[in-house]
Amino acid sequence: MQTAARRSFDYDMPLIQTPTSACQIRQAWAKVADTPDRETADRLKDEIKALLKEKNAVLVAHYYVDPLIQDLALETGGCVGDSLEMARFGAEHEAGTLVVAGVRFMGESAKILCPEKTVLMPDLEAECSLDLGCPEEAFSAFCDQHPDRTVVVYANTSAAVKARADWVVTSSVALEIVSYLKSRGEKLIWGPDRHLGDYIRRETGADMLLWQGSCIVHNEFKGQELAALKAEHPDAVVLVHPESPQSVIELGDVVGSTSKLLKAAVSRPEKKFIVATDLGILHEMQKQAPDKEFIAAPTAGNGGSCKSCAFCPWMAMNSLGGIKYALTSGRNEILLDRKLGEAAKLPLQRMLDFAAGLKRGDVFNGMGPA
Protein backbone atom coordinates (compact mmCIF):
# COMPACT_ATOMS: atom_id res chain seq x y z
CA MET A 1 0.00 0.00 0.00
CA GLN A 2 0.99 3.62 -0.43
CA THR A 3 2.51 5.09 2.71
CA ALA A 4 2.20 8.82 1.97
CA ALA A 5 -0.34 10.76 3.99
CA ARG A 6 -3.50 11.41 2.01
CA ARG A 7 -5.89 14.35 2.15
CA SER A 8 -9.53 13.59 1.35
CA PHE A 9 -11.69 15.86 -0.81
CA ASP A 10 -15.42 15.17 -1.16
CA TYR A 11 -17.56 16.45 -4.02
CA ASP A 12 -21.33 16.26 -4.31
CA MET A 13 -21.68 15.80 -8.05
CA PRO A 14 -24.54 17.91 -9.44
CA LEU A 15 -27.68 16.36 -10.87
CA ILE A 16 -26.87 15.56 -14.48
CA GLN A 17 -29.87 16.51 -16.62
CA THR A 18 -30.00 14.64 -19.91
CA PRO A 19 -32.31 15.76 -22.72
CA THR A 20 -34.73 12.99 -21.67
CA SER A 21 -34.33 12.35 -17.98
CA ALA A 22 -32.45 13.20 -14.82
CA CYS A 23 -29.66 10.95 -13.60
CA GLN A 24 -28.34 11.36 -10.07
CA ILE A 25 -24.59 10.75 -9.97
CA ARG A 26 -23.15 9.25 -6.83
CA GLN A 27 -21.04 11.36 -4.54
CA ALA A 28 -17.53 11.66 -5.90
CA TRP A 29 -14.39 11.90 -3.85
CA ALA A 30 -10.65 12.09 -4.21
CA LYS A 31 -7.88 11.20 -1.76
CA VAL A 32 -4.78 13.12 -2.68
CA ALA A 33 -1.32 12.07 -1.54
CA ASP A 34 0.77 14.77 0.10
CA THR A 35 3.76 16.02 -1.87
CA PRO A 36 6.90 14.20 -0.66
CA ASP A 37 9.94 16.10 0.56
CA ARG A 38 12.88 16.48 -1.82
CA GLU A 39 14.89 13.59 -0.37
CA THR A 40 11.93 11.20 -0.52
CA ALA A 41 11.00 12.32 -4.03
CA ASP A 42 14.54 11.76 -5.31
CA ARG A 43 14.66 8.30 -3.74
CA LEU A 44 11.30 7.35 -5.24
CA LYS A 45 12.32 8.62 -8.68
CA ASP A 46 15.53 6.56 -8.61
CA GLU A 47 13.60 3.45 -7.55
CA ILE A 48 10.98 3.98 -10.25
CA LYS A 49 13.63 4.46 -12.95
CA ALA A 50 15.13 1.09 -12.04
CA LEU A 51 11.71 -0.56 -11.94
CA LEU A 52 10.73 0.80 -15.36
CA LYS A 53 13.84 -0.81 -16.85
CA GLU A 54 13.36 -4.05 -14.97
CA LYS A 55 9.70 -4.38 -15.97
CA ASN A 56 10.10 -3.22 -19.60
CA ALA A 57 7.69 -0.43 -18.75
CA VAL A 58 7.19 3.15 -19.89
CA LEU A 59 5.54 6.04 -18.06
CA VAL A 60 2.79 7.88 -19.94
CA ALA A 61 1.61 11.04 -18.16
CA HIS A 62 -0.94 13.78 -18.70
CA TYR A 63 -0.10 17.48 -18.51
CA TYR A 64 -2.33 17.84 -15.45
CA VAL A 65 -0.51 15.44 -13.10
CA ASP A 66 2.17 16.35 -10.54
CA PRO A 67 5.18 18.08 -12.16
CA LEU A 68 7.43 15.49 -10.48
CA ILE A 69 5.68 12.78 -12.50
CA GLN A 70 5.75 14.81 -15.71
CA ASP A 71 9.50 15.31 -15.39
CA LEU A 72 10.07 11.65 -14.53
CA ALA A 73 8.16 10.54 -17.63
CA LEU A 74 10.36 12.65 -19.88
CA GLU A 75 13.57 11.67 -18.06
CA THR A 76 12.81 7.98 -18.65
CA GLY A 77 11.84 8.17 -22.31
CA GLY A 78 8.12 8.28 -21.66
CA CYS A 79 5.48 10.75 -22.73
CA VAL A 80 3.77 13.84 -21.36
CA GLY A 81 0.81 14.94 -23.42
CA ASP A 82 -2.90 15.36 -23.85
CA SER A 83 -5.17 12.34 -24.06
CA LEU A 84 -4.71 11.96 -27.84
CA GLU A 85 -0.92 12.06 -27.56
CA MET A 86 -0.99 9.60 -24.66
CA ALA A 87 -3.13 7.14 -26.61
CA ARG A 88 -0.96 7.39 -29.70
CA PHE A 89 2.30 7.05 -27.75
CA GLY A 90 1.13 4.03 -25.78
CA ALA A 91 -0.07 2.25 -28.90
CA GLU A 92 3.19 2.83 -30.77
CA HIS A 93 5.72 2.22 -27.97
CA GLU A 94 7.42 -1.17 -27.78
CA ALA A 95 7.23 -1.48 -23.98
CA GLY A 96 5.22 -4.41 -22.69
CA THR A 97 3.89 -2.44 -19.73
CA LEU A 98 2.34 1.03 -19.78
CA VAL A 99 2.13 3.02 -16.55
CA VAL A 100 -0.57 5.60 -17.21
CA ALA A 101 -0.47 8.62 -14.90
CA GLY A 102 -3.81 10.29 -15.42
CA VAL A 103 -7.43 9.35 -14.78
CA ARG A 104 -9.11 6.01 -15.27
CA PHE A 105 -10.49 6.53 -18.77
CA MET A 106 -6.94 7.16 -20.00
CA GLY A 107 -5.80 3.82 -18.63
CA GLU A 108 -8.82 2.14 -20.21
CA SER A 109 -8.07 3.77 -23.57
CA ALA A 110 -4.52 2.44 -23.41
CA LYS A 111 -5.80 -1.07 -22.68
CA ILE A 112 -8.40 -0.84 -25.46
CA LEU A 113 -5.71 0.03 -27.99
CA CYS A 114 -3.11 -2.38 -26.59
CA PRO A 115 -4.97 -5.39 -25.15
CA GLU A 116 -1.78 -7.45 -25.22
CA LYS A 117 0.04 -4.99 -22.94
CA THR A 118 -0.12 -4.68 -19.18
CA VAL A 119 -1.59 -1.30 -18.25
CA LEU A 120 -0.99 -0.07 -14.71
CA MET A 121 -2.13 3.11 -12.98
CA PRO A 122 -0.86 4.80 -9.81
CA ASP A 123 -4.44 4.86 -8.47
CA LEU A 124 -7.42 3.08 -10.03
CA GLU A 125 -9.81 5.37 -8.17
CA ALA A 126 -8.64 8.46 -10.08
CA GLU A 127 -11.92 9.27 -11.80
CA CYS A 128 -13.21 12.04 -14.08
CA SER A 129 -16.38 14.08 -13.57
CA LEU A 130 -17.23 13.72 -17.27
CA ASP A 131 -16.96 9.94 -17.06
CA LEU A 132 -18.94 9.83 -13.81
CA GLY A 133 -21.55 12.10 -15.37
CA CYS A 134 -22.21 9.77 -18.31
CA PRO A 135 -23.38 6.37 -17.03
CA GLU A 136 -23.44 3.80 -19.82
CA GLU A 137 -26.99 2.59 -19.23
CA ALA A 138 -28.52 6.08 -19.25
CA PHE A 139 -26.44 7.20 -22.22
CA SER A 140 -27.31 4.10 -24.24
CA ALA A 141 -31.00 4.64 -23.54
CA PHE A 142 -30.67 8.21 -24.82
CA CYS A 143 -28.91 7.02 -27.97
CA ASP A 144 -31.57 4.37 -28.56
CA GLN A 145 -34.18 7.11 -28.76
CA HIS A 146 -32.34 8.65 -31.73
CA PRO A 147 -31.26 5.70 -33.90
CA ASP A 148 -30.79 7.92 -36.96
CA ARG A 149 -27.97 9.89 -35.33
CA THR A 150 -24.24 9.20 -35.36
CA VAL A 151 -22.93 8.89 -31.80
CA VAL A 152 -19.79 10.91 -31.07
CA VAL A 153 -18.29 10.73 -27.58
CA TYR A 154 -15.45 12.57 -25.96
CA ALA A 155 -12.47 10.46 -24.87
CA ASN A 156 -13.35 11.30 -21.24
CA THR A 157 -15.75 8.36 -21.02
CA SER A 158 -15.75 4.74 -19.91
CA ALA A 159 -14.96 1.84 -22.19
CA ALA A 160 -18.65 0.90 -22.11
CA VAL A 161 -19.71 4.33 -23.40
CA LYS A 162 -17.02 4.24 -26.08
CA ALA A 163 -18.33 0.85 -27.19
CA ARG A 164 -21.75 2.45 -27.76
CA ALA A 165 -20.27 5.19 -29.95
CA ASP A 166 -19.52 5.48 -33.65
CA TRP A 167 -16.65 7.92 -33.07
CA VAL A 168 -14.43 8.85 -30.14
CA VAL A 169 -12.82 12.29 -30.21
CA THR A 170 -10.42 14.36 -28.14
CA SER A 171 -10.37 18.15 -28.02
CA SER A 172 -7.40 18.05 -30.41
CA VAL A 173 -9.47 16.67 -33.31
CA ALA A 174 -13.11 17.17 -32.30
CA LEU A 175 -13.72 20.16 -34.57
CA GLU A 176 -12.23 18.43 -37.59
CA ILE A 177 -14.13 15.19 -37.07
CA VAL A 178 -17.48 16.90 -36.49
CA SER A 179 -16.90 19.14 -39.52
CA TYR A 180 -16.18 16.02 -41.56
CA LEU A 181 -19.34 14.29 -40.34
CA LYS A 182 -21.42 17.40 -41.03
CA SER A 183 -20.07 17.51 -44.59
CA ARG A 184 -21.48 13.99 -44.99
CA GLY A 185 -24.92 15.18 -43.88
CA GLU A 186 -24.84 13.28 -40.59
CA LYS A 187 -26.80 14.35 -37.52
CA LEU A 188 -25.06 13.73 -34.22
CA ILE A 189 -25.46 12.79 -30.61
CA TRP A 190 -22.64 14.30 -28.57
CA GLY A 191 -21.52 13.35 -25.10
CA PRO A 192 -20.68 14.03 -22.41
CA ASP A 193 -19.29 17.61 -22.11
CA ARG A 194 -22.01 20.15 -22.87
CA HIS A 195 -19.63 23.11 -23.10
CA LEU A 196 -17.31 21.46 -25.60
CA GLY A 197 -20.31 20.16 -27.53
CA ASP A 198 -21.92 23.59 -27.66
CA TYR A 199 -18.64 25.18 -28.80
CA ILE A 200 -18.27 22.63 -31.60
CA ARG A 201 -21.91 23.07 -32.61
CA ARG A 202 -21.46 26.84 -32.84
CA GLU A 203 -18.20 26.54 -34.76
CA THR A 204 -19.37 23.93 -37.26
CA GLY A 205 -23.12 24.45 -37.49
CA ALA A 206 -23.60 20.70 -37.06
CA ASP A 207 -26.94 19.28 -35.92
CA MET A 208 -26.01 17.95 -32.46
CA LEU A 209 -27.99 16.70 -29.49
CA LEU A 210 -25.89 17.29 -26.38
CA TRP A 211 -25.54 15.21 -23.24
CA GLN A 212 -25.38 17.62 -20.30
CA GLY A 213 -22.14 16.69 -18.53
CA SER A 214 -19.32 19.00 -17.49
CA CYS A 215 -15.75 19.01 -16.21
CA ILE A 216 -15.50 19.95 -12.55
CA VAL A 217 -12.41 22.06 -13.33
CA HIS A 218 -13.39 23.94 -16.49
CA ASN A 219 -17.01 24.45 -15.47
CA GLU A 220 -15.83 26.75 -12.68
CA PHE A 221 -14.17 29.39 -14.87
CA LYS A 222 -16.15 32.64 -14.82
CA GLY A 223 -16.65 34.90 -17.84
CA GLN A 224 -17.37 38.12 -15.94
CA GLU A 225 -14.35 37.76 -13.71
CA LEU A 226 -12.16 36.75 -16.66
CA ALA A 227 -13.24 39.89 -18.51
CA ALA A 228 -12.22 41.98 -15.48
CA LEU A 229 -8.84 40.22 -15.28
CA LYS A 230 -8.32 40.74 -19.00
CA ALA A 231 -9.02 44.46 -18.54
CA GLU A 232 -6.29 44.56 -15.88
CA HIS A 233 -3.87 42.89 -18.30
CA PRO A 234 -4.80 44.18 -21.77
CA ASP A 235 -1.50 42.91 -23.20
CA ALA A 236 -2.18 39.31 -22.12
CA VAL A 237 -3.21 36.54 -24.50
CA VAL A 238 -6.16 34.54 -23.13
CA LEU A 239 -5.80 30.76 -23.54
CA VAL A 240 -9.03 28.80 -23.04
CA HIS A 241 -9.84 25.10 -23.07
CA PRO A 242 -13.19 24.47 -24.83
CA GLU A 243 -14.58 22.51 -21.88
CA SER A 244 -15.16 25.97 -20.36
CA PRO A 245 -18.52 27.81 -20.42
CA GLN A 246 -19.41 29.89 -23.49
CA SER A 247 -18.89 33.18 -21.64
CA VAL A 248 -15.26 32.15 -21.03
CA ILE A 249 -14.65 30.74 -24.51
CA GLU A 250 -15.84 33.98 -26.11
CA LEU A 251 -13.03 35.84 -24.33
CA GLY A 252 -10.34 33.46 -25.55
CA ASP A 253 -7.68 34.55 -28.03
CA VAL A 254 -6.73 30.88 -28.44
CA VAL A 255 -9.27 28.11 -27.81
CA GLY A 256 -8.16 24.50 -27.96
CA SER A 257 -6.72 21.38 -26.38
CA THR A 258 -3.95 21.45 -23.81
CA SER A 259 -1.42 20.76 -26.56
CA LYS A 260 -2.74 23.64 -28.65
CA LEU A 261 -2.64 26.01 -25.67
CA LEU A 262 0.91 24.93 -24.84
CA LYS A 263 2.02 25.47 -28.42
CA ALA A 264 0.48 28.95 -28.44
CA ALA A 265 2.16 29.87 -25.16
CA VAL A 266 5.56 28.85 -26.51
CA SER A 267 5.31 30.09 -30.10
CA ARG A 268 3.46 33.40 -29.79
CA PRO A 269 5.59 36.53 -29.34
CA GLU A 270 3.54 37.97 -26.48
CA LYS A 271 5.05 37.75 -23.00
CA LYS A 272 1.92 37.47 -20.84
CA PHE A 273 -0.84 34.84 -20.88
CA ILE A 274 -4.03 34.24 -18.93
CA VAL A 275 -4.66 30.50 -18.74
CA ALA A 276 -8.17 29.00 -18.42
CA THR A 277 -7.50 25.31 -17.96
CA ASP A 278 -6.15 23.02 -15.26
CA LEU A 279 -3.09 24.71 -13.81
CA GLY A 280 -1.06 21.53 -14.12
CA ILE A 281 -0.24 22.72 -17.64
CA LEU A 282 1.68 25.69 -16.24
CA HIS A 283 4.64 23.46 -15.39
CA GLU A 284 5.33 22.62 -19.01
CA MET A 285 4.50 26.15 -20.17
CA GLN A 286 7.02 27.63 -17.77
CA LYS A 287 9.64 25.04 -18.72
CA GLN A 288 9.30 25.75 -22.42
CA ALA A 289 8.80 29.51 -22.09
CA PRO A 290 10.66 30.59 -18.93
CA ASP A 291 10.72 34.23 -19.99
CA LYS A 292 6.93 34.52 -20.07
CA GLU A 293 4.32 35.24 -17.40
CA PHE A 294 1.31 32.98 -16.88
CA ILE A 295 -1.74 34.10 -14.92
CA ALA A 296 -4.47 31.73 -13.71
CA ALA A 297 -7.97 32.53 -14.92
CA PRO A 298 -10.52 33.04 -12.10
CA THR A 299 -12.64 30.08 -10.98
CA ALA A 300 -15.01 31.83 -8.57
CA GLY A 301 -17.08 35.00 -8.59
CA ASN A 302 -16.77 37.87 -6.15
CA GLY A 303 -17.14 36.47 -2.66
CA GLY A 304 -17.57 32.96 -4.04
CA SER A 305 -15.61 29.80 -3.57
CA CYS A 306 -14.40 27.09 -5.91
CA LYS A 307 -14.41 23.30 -5.63
CA SER A 308 -11.50 22.38 -7.87
CA CYS A 309 -9.87 25.83 -8.04
CA ALA A 310 -8.36 24.89 -11.43
CA PHE A 311 -6.76 21.65 -10.21
CA CYS A 312 -8.36 18.30 -10.99
CA PRO A 313 -8.54 16.40 -7.68
CA TRP A 314 -8.42 13.04 -9.45
CA MET A 315 -5.32 13.95 -11.46
CA ALA A 316 -3.76 14.89 -8.13
CA MET A 317 -4.28 11.32 -6.89
CA ASN A 318 -1.36 10.25 -9.07
CA SER A 319 1.80 10.07 -6.98
CA LEU A 320 5.35 8.75 -7.11
CA GLY A 321 4.43 6.35 -4.34
CA GLY A 322 1.52 5.09 -6.39
CA ILE A 323 3.73 4.48 -9.42
CA LYS A 324 6.23 2.52 -7.32
CA TYR A 325 3.42 0.51 -5.73
CA ALA A 326 1.92 -0.40 -9.11
CA LEU A 327 5.28 -1.51 -10.51
CA THR A 328 6.40 -3.51 -7.48
CA SER A 329 3.07 -5.19 -6.72
CA GLY A 330 1.62 -5.61 -10.19
CA ARG A 331 -1.63 -4.28 -8.72
CA ASN A 332 -3.69 -1.35 -10.02
CA GLU A 333 -3.94 -3.06 -13.40
CA ILE A 334 -6.59 -2.06 -15.92
CA LEU A 335 -8.55 -5.15 -16.93
CA LEU A 336 -11.27 -5.12 -19.58
CA ASP A 337 -13.63 -7.73 -20.95
CA ARG A 338 -12.29 -8.80 -24.34
CA LYS A 339 -15.52 -8.21 -26.26
CA LEU A 340 -16.03 -4.82 -24.62
CA GLY A 341 -12.48 -3.81 -25.49
CA GLU A 342 -12.91 -4.87 -29.10
CA ALA A 343 -16.16 -2.90 -29.42
CA ALA A 344 -14.62 0.19 -27.83
CA LYS A 345 -11.54 -0.02 -30.05
CA LEU A 346 -13.48 0.53 -33.28
CA PRO A 347 -14.49 4.19 -32.66
CA LEU A 348 -11.22 4.94 -30.86
CA GLN A 349 -9.09 3.59 -33.69
CA ARG A 350 -11.31 5.48 -36.15
CA MET A 351 -10.25 8.71 -34.43
CA LEU A 352 -6.56 7.79 -34.47
CA ASP A 353 -6.72 6.90 -38.16
CA PHE A 354 -8.49 10.17 -38.92
CA ALA A 355 -5.91 12.15 -36.92
CA ALA A 356 -3.08 10.39 -38.76
CA GLY A 357 -4.75 11.29 -42.04
CA LEU A 358 -4.98 14.92 -41.00
CA LYS A 359 -1.27 14.88 -40.29
CA ARG A 360 -0.59 13.51 -43.77
CA GLY A 361 -2.93 16.06 -45.30
CA ASP A 362 -5.13 13.49 -47.01
CA VAL A 363 -8.33 13.70 -44.94
CA PHE A 364 -11.13 16.13 -45.65
CA ASN A 365 -11.84 18.09 -42.50
CA GLY A 366 -15.01 19.85 -43.57
CA MET A 367 -13.18 23.04 -44.51
CA GLY A 368 -10.95 21.80 -47.30
CA PRO A 369 -7.88 19.57 -47.39
CA ALA A 370 -6.04 19.57 -44.07
Swiss-Prot record:
Positions annotated to bind [4Fe-4S] cluster: 128, 215, 312
Pathway(s): Cofactor biosynthesis; NAD(+) biosynthesis; quinolinate from iminoaspartate: step 1/1
InterPro entries the UniProt entry points to: NadA, NadA_sf, Quinolinate_synth_A_type1
Co-factor: note: Binds 1 [4Fe-4S] cluster per subunit.
Catalytic activity, as annotated: iminosuccinate + dihydroxyacetone phosphate = quinolinate + phosphate + 2 H2O + H(+)
Superkingdom in the source lineage: Bacteria
Gene Ontology terms for molecular function: 4 iron, 4 sulfur cluster binding; metal ion binding; quinolinate synthetase A activity
Keywords from the named record: 4Fe-4S, Cytoplasm, Iron, Iron-sulfur, Metal-binding, Pyridine nucleotide biosynthesis, Transferase
Cellular component, GO, one term: cytosol
EC number: 2.5.1.72
Enzyme class: transferase
Assigned protein family: Belongs to the quinolinate synthase family. Type 1 subfamily.
Function of the molecule: Catalyzes the condensation of iminoaspartate with dihydroxyacetone phosphate to form quinolinate.
PANTHER family: QUINOLINATE SYNTHASE, CHLOROPLASTIC, QUINOLINATE SYNTHETASE A
Protein name per its UniProtKB record: Quinolinate synthase
